Amino acid sequence: MDEPPFTEAALEQALAEPCELDAALLTDIEDMLQLINNQDSDFPGLFDAPYAGVAGGTDPTSPDASSPGSPTPPPSTMSSPLEGFLGGARTPPPPPVSPTQPAPTPLKMYPSVPAFSPGPGIKEEPVPLTILQPPTPQPLSGALLPQSLPALAPPQLSPAPVLGYPSPPGSFSSATPPGSTSQTLPGLPLASLPGVLPVSVHTQVQSAAPQQLLTATATPVVSPGTTTVTSQIQQVPVLLQPHFIKADSLLLTTMKTDMGTPVKAAGIGSLAPGTAVQAAPLQTLVSGGTILATVPLVVDTDKLPINRLAAGGKALSSGQSRGEKRTAHNAIEKRYRSSINDKIIELKDLVVGTEAKLNKSAVLRKAIDYIRFLQQSNQKLKQENLSLRTAAHKSKSLKDLVSCSSGGRTDVPMEGVKPEVVDTLSPPPSDAGSPSQSSPLSLGSRGSSSGGSGSDSEPDSPVFEDSQMKPEQLPAPHGRGMLDRSRLALCVLVFLCLSCNPLASLMGSWALPGPSDATSAYHGPWRSVLGAEGRDGPGWVLWLLPPLVWLTNGLLVLLFLALLFVYGEPVTRPHSDPAVRFWRHRKQADLDLARGDFAQAAQQLWLALRALGRPLPTSHLDLACSLLWNLIRHLLQRLWVGRWLAGRAGGLRRDSALEADTRTSACDAALVYHKLHQLHTMGKYPGGHLDAANLALSALNLAECAGDALSVAVLAEVYVAAALRVKTSLPRALHFLTRFFLSSARQACLAQSGSVPVAMQWLCHPVGHRFFVDGDWAVCGAPRDSLYSVAGNPVDPLAQVTQLFREHLLEQALHCVAQPSPGPGSADGDREFSEALGFLQLLNSCCDTAGAPACSFSIASSTAATAGTDPVAKWWASLTAVVTHWLGRDEEAAERLYPLVEHLPRALQESERPLPRAALHSFKAARALLGRGKAESGSASLAMCEKASGYLQDSLAATPAGSSIDKAMQLLLCDLLLVARTSLWQRQKPPPPSQASQGSSSGAQASALELRGFQRDLSGLRRLAQSFRPAMRRVFLHEATARLMAGASPARTHQLLDRSLRRRAGPCGRGGAAAAAAAELEPRPTRREQAEALLLASCYLPPGFLSAPGQRVGMLAEAARTLEKLGDRRLLHDCQQMLMRLGGGTTVTSS
């Protein structure tokens, strides 16, 4: 400290000298102060002095202290703050006011005006800081006066409570002993030190925030006597001694004073007369918790760091009241809770949906469970990806492995990868400097750590966690097989070699000498010398040449067959990568089939075949090659050569495991081909007839090669599908192949199991075989909406053909009853009824084995091996059988079928067509009138007939142009109702013996209600006869009955009965063609109809219409003989009773 002391004369000289600040700087400072004045209203009570009673202080109510409401300082103060700083005169500003120098006054301590209400973590203590005298007086540069501050020992920090506010343990205080408010140099009065400026700085340290806040204000005032000079300073830094304060984190902030309130600063020093002091703020450096006082510096708040501004804002906001703090805290908490609730609601919508109602705990629990499920799924997928990637890497070459794994990057630890996987994935070191072990994991880590360029960054490699693959599970080199076009090219090459036989030509030209060699041995320029042929000529070569050529050709053919069937056939080993991919696609296809997504199922089956190394043809050339190869292969397998070689696929050596794998692979491929063929047949898979034929042949060839790996039922189903393809796609001239495939299916079943599957037994029946081969039917893609049977499996064409056959049997049985064949054998017995019952019995057996239920969509399942039922077809068959038994007057057989007919199936109950209800009510009415049970009353029976008639009329009106089976069923029901009404009429009013003997029909008239119902049913029968000609012969008989019931003129009745009794002779002589045409238009009556007409004529016609007196008895006798042959026991009983009345107890026997 060798500088001269700072004297009062030097201070006056420095203040008197003109300032070197230019006009621009002055203008900026004025603008800054004006800004401070404008913003002063933001903190009106910032520098108020609410505390009094400090030692050495003055009363806040004294005249020296300005009131808070005064807008301007008193007149004794300087004209402007700038003049107080500069102390010199300028041209624009007024001259400075030179204050008088009063006598030195004792030092007074004033408390610093707090910027905000102190909180519990703030401690206030006034700290006097003494500024030593500088060595030499220097002129003031601008508004700042540099000073030399000697370093003193750092004072001890003592946490003492001030102003009634408790101090927390972690707070800091100024270096003032407890109980003292100011500190001066010991032993010296402050006034006796000229040139010394004693300043007391009030320090506030806040330690509640992470960064401690140090706020201080120091306003030196030149005071003559009681004159107070108020300095208003914006951004006043702390003036500290050059000592170190240890703190965790301190931040120096600035404060501003109230422009309208002159406040006395704490720690005003007394100056000698003539001295002027200007405040020199010092900027402190904060680094590592240590504060060091350095050169004074004023920092603009606009250029402060954000953290300092935030800290200052926090300091200002902490001065609010406790209520405002609580309100702000509540608002923050409300926003926090609202944010949490929004996120929980969003989480609930993601996990359980928007409609669910759960509390927060349940939502979090559900989210945790879902996250665990996703983690487990992710783990499984990673393991599966690992196995697939491992197999892919193992199958690649070294170059491909290095190229695909050198740029990869992964963060998976090496302990998650098994050693065999690392050995497989690690190529050998390429140079001497490379490490001995290298893997995609290590390569990725080196690549990521060594370079920083963007070219080295590659996509992340898959996570290798675990591998269950074993070396013996990998596919064999020959597992891929040959393509069909390669096979066909090899076949064509061998065929050309065998047909052209170039080997024989080559061997012949090599073995046999040429013509010139046989005649001359040497050709000179002038003459030729004939050579002599040796005695042992090439005869043995000529003898050995043909066998050698054929042996060589045979070896070539065997080699060709071995390449095609043994080494060219793809074999999939279990647990290999192709097997894993195949089963994945196949299981997905099963799920798609069960879901009804047939297009996606076909796509999965296509991918499954590709995984097995048997891709489907994608072009016309590939399709032609594949079809020709399958034809050639099928022919070779029929010769047992191809089947024997195909059983050795994979190698000629005998290996039981390899043979089993070969059969299993062929079985899997055959099932997929067969299912694709079924989907194509049902219209679920696109493609033409050639594609379908190729699929059928591929399935058939592989099924024959599968052997015992494929069940007998599936093999028979494949044969039947091939026969169905011949029936559908090939022309009629080639339909004989259908018999061949059906015979092969039957032989395969009988050879292995000795029985035919239940769902295919109808194909072995002559009627079923004839229907399949010669029937005019077609398979449609959409399920058939039939009233007489239920559809089976929608993806099985055989189930649809079986449904068509059941309806065909029902139709044949109805035609046998409604339209029997008028052959010569029909008079020998009940042929029409026996044939109908035979068809119905076969129909019942087919209904019991209707095929698999519609829900079995598995590819491996066979519809032929499982049995189902067809309740709809069974109900119609039972109803037809009951009606047939009624018409044959066999009540015992009909009663056994009553329980099956009484309950209508649910499918028919839900049907909108009235025909099933008409059939049910007709059955009930006929059972009441024709059965052996207790007879119902006339009114009840008539009511049931009327109800059945109403449903039947609705059915006739709804289907005017229905199918032949609908018309046959309507004819059967109409006839049944008319027969029931006739029986009701005969039961109520039987002809008495006198009227029967006289032939009078006047007494047997029915009621008007009965006649009205009979006429309605008869009109329905006439309407049906217009479109269905077999109903015409029943119209004549029932019309005659209606006239008899009404008592009409017997002449027309006799004509109608005569048409039923007339027997037409064969066409002969003139008019034979016209008679034949008439016979075709009008069907001939059956033997039963003739017997019924004879019975009606003999019972109800008057005697005048009979030619002879004994003709009535003869007609009854003939009718009795006919009914006895037909087996109609009820009509036979009625006929015998009539003969007994007419003949005096005589009976008629068959002659």
Curated annotation (Swiss-Prot):
Chain spans, region Interaction with LMNA: 234-497
Annotated Pro residues bias: 91-105
GO molecular function: DNA binding; DNA-binding transcription factor activity, RNA polymerase II-specific; protein dimerization activity; RNA polymerase II cis-regulatory region sequence-specific DNA binding
Membrane topology (Cytoplasmic): 1-487, 569-1151
Alphabetical keyword list: Activator, Cholesterol metabolism, Cytoplasmic vesicle, DNA-binding, Endoplasmic reticulum, Golgi apparatus, Lipid metabolism, Membrane, Nucleus, Phosphoprotein, Steroid metabolism, Sterol metabolism, Transcription, Transcription regulation, Transmembrane, Transmembrane helix, Ubl conjugation
Residues that bear Phosphoserine: 98, 117, 338-339, 397, 403, 457, 1060
PTM notes: Phosphorylated by AMPK, leading to suppress protein processing and nuclear translocation, and repress target gene expression. Phosphorylation at Ser-403 by SIK1 represses activity possibly by inhibiting DNA-binding.
Name of the featured protein: Sterol regulatory element-binding protein 1
Organism whose genome encodes this protein: Sus scrofa (Pig)
